[in-house]
């Protein structure tokens, strides 16, 4: 199942993590989740109120979540094709078993990191399983590094295989996810990228639940490679506990901003950790009264018609972006970072924080 593991430690999948900002127990302003915002007066306009509270006849969105998986074909510590094949097969079986629709966002540069034919077969397996695919750029770089023109070129370069596979399955390439959730600085760069995406038929996939699964995933890979079963089980338990707390926090944040539960969009990654945890993740969603829906269905929630006002270097989720638009604080007092033990293990496994 896992060939050449001991010698296979590489920077495979490094693109997802290298630009993540360092985490702190008290997020400073502009960090991953930003700091606590000064309390400001909330001025209600009738149209804004209808978006938040739901206009007459608006679609009820309580108890819904769309699962999105970044960095396909896989995010791993190891350039091992059997490992990638196994985790995707396990993940897809679990999603189908629990009737959870999902979309995977592809970095096409990964197709040549191991065996191109088998990597493409992984993407095809997602579509064969009834899932969807989207564009995550070719190289998982950012507008900050590439500039608007270079970033747009990287998006276009990330299309060909994904678009062809979708067409073969009677689908079109409609969805784009920004790497690191970095959407462009200054405003003119963000606007140029947004305009190009719109002109080329893309919709941006927001994030309204982010449980930092990437931080747990590589220590988990490392534990498997070292045949440390006790550590593997401990990391899995810590991840699931953290995920359940984090999902609950975002539900509270939704109540804070909107006075109701929106249809959530959850950011995950195509990892062995999520493959091994998919049954438990499904249980967490059921306990939190969340039913799986497609990304298209979740995006019908009126909240996603709100403007995204954020222009900044840090990638932040849409709850924080909307808190700026609505001039309303998020419940940062109850936010928890991943356990220090996990942060330290991540840095030992792959010390690539910027």
Stretch-by-stretch model annotation:
Residues 13, 58-63:
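Boundary at the C-terminal end of the N-terminal hydrophobic targeting segment
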Residues 79-80, 141-167, 186-200, 208-258, ...:
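Alpha-helical scaffold elements lining the catalytic groove of polysaccharide deacetylases
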Residues 97-102, 206, 260, 270-354:
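C-terminal domain-boundary segment and adjacent tail
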């Amino acid at each position: 199942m896992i060939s050449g593991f001991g010698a296979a430690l590489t920077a495979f999948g490094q693109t997802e993590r290298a630009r993540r900002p360092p985490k702190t127990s008290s997020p400073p302003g502009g960090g991953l989740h930003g700091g606590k915002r000064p309390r400001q007066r909330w001025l209600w306009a009738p149209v804004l109120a209808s978006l938040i509270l739901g206009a007459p006849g608006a679609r009820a969105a309580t108890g819904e979540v769309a699962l999105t998986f970044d960095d396909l074909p896989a995010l791993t510590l190891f350039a091992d094709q059997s490992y990638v094949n196994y985790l995707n097969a396990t993940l897809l079986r679990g999603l189908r078993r629990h009737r959870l629709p999902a979309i995977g966002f592809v970095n096409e540069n990964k197709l040549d990191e191991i065996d191109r034919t088998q990597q493409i077969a992984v993407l095809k397996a997602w579509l064969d399983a009834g899932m969807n695919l989207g564009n995550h750029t070719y190289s998982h770089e950012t507008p900050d590094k590439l500039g608007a023109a270079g970033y747009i070129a990287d998006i276009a370069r990330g299309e060909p295989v994904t678009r062809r596979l979708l067409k073969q399955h009677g689908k079109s390439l409609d969805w784009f996810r920004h790497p690191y959730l970095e959407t462009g600085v200054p405003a003119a760069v963000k606007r140029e990228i947004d305009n190009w995406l719109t002109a080329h038929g893309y919709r941006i996939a927001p994030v309204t639940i982010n449980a930092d699964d990437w931080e747990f995933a590589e220590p988990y890979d490392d534990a498997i490679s070292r045949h440390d079963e006790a550590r593997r089980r401990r990391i899995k338990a810590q991840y699931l506990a953290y995920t359940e707390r984090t999902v609950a926090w975002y539900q509270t944040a939704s109540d804070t901003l909107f006075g109701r539960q929106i249809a959530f969009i959850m950011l995950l990654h195509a990892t062995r950790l999520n493959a091994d945890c998919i049954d438990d993740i499904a249980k967490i969603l059921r306990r939190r009264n969340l039913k799986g829906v497609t990304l298209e269905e979740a995006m019908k929630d009126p909240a996603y018609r709100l403007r995204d006002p954020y222009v900044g270097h840090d990638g932040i989720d849409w709850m924080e972006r909307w808190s700026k638009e609505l001039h309303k604080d998020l419940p940062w007092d109850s936010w928890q970072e991943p356990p220090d033990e996990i942060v330290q293990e991540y840095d030992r496994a792959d010390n690539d924080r910027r």
